Amino acid sequence: MEFIAKKADIATLSTQCVVVFCKDGKLMASASHLDTEQHGLLTHQLSIKAISPTAGSHLWLTLAPTKSAKHSKALLVQLGESKKKSADITIEDIRKISQKLASTLNSAKLKDAAVFFDSALPASGDCTLEKLAHTLALEIERASYRFSLKAGTKNTPATLKKVVFVATNSAETKTLRNGANTGSAMGKGINAARELGNLPGNICTPNYLAEQAKQLAAGCKKLTSKALGEKQMERLGMGAFLSVSKGSDQEGKLILLEYKGAAANKAPHVLVGKGVTFDTGGISLKPGANMDEMKFDMCGAASVLGTFKALVELDAKVNVVGIIAAAENMPSGGASKPGDVVTSMSGQTIEILNTDAEGRLVLCDALTYAERYKPKSVVDIATLTGACVVALGNHAAGLYSNTQSVADALLKAGEETHDRAWQMPLWDDYQRQLDSNFADMGNIGGMPGGSITAACFLSRYTKKYPWAHLDIAGVAWHSGAKKGATGRPVSLLVNYLLNN
């Protein structure tokens, strides 16, 4: 998708469709200009209440041919009605407007469109013109996603390829361009994560993820990628990771990405993604119902790759390291058994009480590996526990941290992008649930506070740096009729990295 921001006249800009706005029952400048050319068509529609006053409502209009007209369709979009003078457009309005408009444009079989913003929002404050441009570009990108493997008429490719954001002056052009660039980059990153998440486990293997990282790095001089195999991990003493991958015919991979967009002396942020490309539960086998959704157990890894995709698109001025712990969790004669004791890279021993609590086993060695980068912060992202879904449902990711400033920054990023998280306790009181008679710790802590004890387990490997854990089990994918990966929390992560 190409986004262009420029100053233009609605009478002379060549495009298939012009998008104009109304607010408080009145046409905005470009809509009013179009109305004059169309002999009162738009004001007539307002007078008969053909468009709802609800923010995001829209009305398609077929335009009468004129001498100067270079477009045949118009889309009139409602910004909403203020109930009182102090009320204005809210962040929620911006999101609704953008989602509805993006969906409408992508389903209209248009090749291009032009959006006339007409200073619809102020340059400063919570709800700005840049925020509207950012959100609209992101939602247009998101609405354009089609799963690559699905064939047939139900998967018609999106036709919209170019959107012009039209400004009224040069300052507004810059504002719209900035908003469109960040929104489009985030949207591309989200879609990349969705695609990886949606791929079946027979295609998206640990090696496939490593190849995707390699391909992404090939297109950017600031990004490098490499992958460690099981022999290299064995030499590093990654017994926890290998206890998971050894049950599968697919070799486990520790995938490493380094994006160097800032000065070399600036400490990097590190993102650690759980990449269990299919999780059967191992010997502690999961029930058959809905097991197909365990292909989504690598959505943490997908979000890391999606975030790097966005950073590359933005040419971001930050240093970021990505570590993806990629493995399959399969039952076999070589798989780990309940009661096995393994030694992690940190030297701590773990009694594997349940082989279906495998995510923390691959992550703990990856978190230990992260120490070598002397990071500014480390954020791990994982579809870690069903207990988090019980606690928070499908709207907020669970957030745990050993450093409140990092937690606050992530919470703020989530609020700003509507990719929200909720901070959970990480108290020492929960640590004793991990006690083991045969090792330094067990890999599960019982049913009470299951998401918390999983985070407590990880915290034992993060003593040397500021760390946060995002449990995305409830937000990484949708089930049911709209089954599919969401691409979360790419927008949260990108916002966090750009602002910290």
From Swiss-Prot:
GO cellular component: cytoplasm
GO terms assigned for molecular function: manganese ion binding; metalloaminopeptidase activity
A biological process term (GO) from this entry: proteolysis
Gene giving rise to this polypeptide: pepA
Binding site for Mn(2+) 2: 274, 279, 297, 358
Main location class: cytoplasm
Residues reported to bind Mn(2+) 1: 279, 356, 358
CC cofactor note: Binds 2 manganese ions per subunit.
Protein name from the UniProt record: Probable cytosol aminopeptidase
Biological role: Presumably involved in the processing and regular turnover of intracellular proteins. Catalyzes the removal of unsubstituted N-terminal amino acids from various peptides.
EC number: 3.4.11.1, 3.4.11.10
Listed InterPro entries: Leucine_aapep/pepB, Macro_dom-like, Peptidase_M17_C, Peptidase_M17_leu_NH2_pept, Peptidase_M17_N
Keywords: Aminopeptidase, Cytoplasm, Hydrolase, Manganese, Metal-binding, Protease
Enzyme class: hydrolase
Origin superkingdom: Bacteria
